[in-house]
Amino acid sequence: MLIHLQKVCPSEQVDHLRDLIGQGGFVDGGTTAGQVARAVKANEQLEAGARVDTVRSEVRKALMAHAGFVSFARPKTLSRILVSRYRDGMAYGPHIDDALMGGRRADLSFTLFLSDPDSYDGGELVMDGPDGETEIKLAAGDAVVYATSAIHQVAPVTRGERVAVVGWVRSLVRRPDQREILFDLDQVSAALFARDGKTRELDLVLKTKANLLRQWAED
């Protein structure tokens, strides 16, 4: 299961982040890949320093303020936030992200797109699933969140430049099926409240959600 989050960062913040990133230096992205993934990874990453620290802080705050992200991911921690850049000819072949990022279990991965989709060709995030491949290329400021266990790749960029922020989430709820149940209950409770306000039925849904989270959460 994956989710498309719209407007995680508004256009003004996207411009600010792009300015910050544009002033920084980049290093070979292979330095942060595992032994197997390194063989298929050809991109660049913003070097360590104050700029990438600022980007990490702003993106973390933006995600944690986005109701859809919080509901879907149930985040406990965000780790290893990186800024990646793909220029003409660069790509990242099929791979699986590490189970542990920064010593923490990684349940979900995210990609926050910062380049306008019409400013580059190629560069789609390609997810491998039971029904085949799904290509994802979002507006600047939008993000996609998906299972870290999924095989995925970044298609070769054939024109322009693709800049994105990527990172990993340890969820309060380890199992994806349980996270999906809680996410569905969030949607139901929001719809009930919008339609009828506070009712007995809404209270029962909220009680059920809270009790399930109490059973499943790893705090």
Curated annotation (Swiss-Prot):
Q: Which residues cross the membrane?
A: none
Q: E.C. number, please? A: 1.14.11.-
Q: Does the keyword Secreted apply?
A: no
Task: Tell me which residues bind Fe cation.
Answer: 95, 97, 152
Q: Which Gene3D superfamilies match?
A: q2cbj1_9rhob like domain, Rabenosyn, Rab binding domain
Which residues belong to any copy of the Fe2OG dioxygenase domain? Answer: 77-171
Instruction: List UniProt keywords, sorted A-Z.
Output: Dioxygenase, Iron, Metal-binding, Oxidoreductase, Vitamin C
Q: What enzyme class is recorded for this protein?
A: oxidoreductase
Q: What is this protein called?
A: PKHD-type hydroxylase Mmar10_1675
Q: Would I find Oxidoreductase among this entry's keywords?
A: yes
Any one biological process term the GO annotation gives: intracellular iron ion homeostasis
Entry's InterPro entries? Oxoglu/Fe-dep_dioxygenase_dom (IPR005123), PKHD_C (IPR041097), PKHD_hydroxylase (IPR023550), Pro_4_hyd_alph (IPR006620), Pro_4_hyd_alph_FE2OG_OXY (IPR044862)
Q: Which GO terms describe its molecular function?
A: 2-oxoglutarate-dependent dioxygenase activity; iron ion binding; L-ascorbic acid binding
Among PANTHER family, the record links this protein to: PKHD-TYPE HYDROXYLASE YBIX
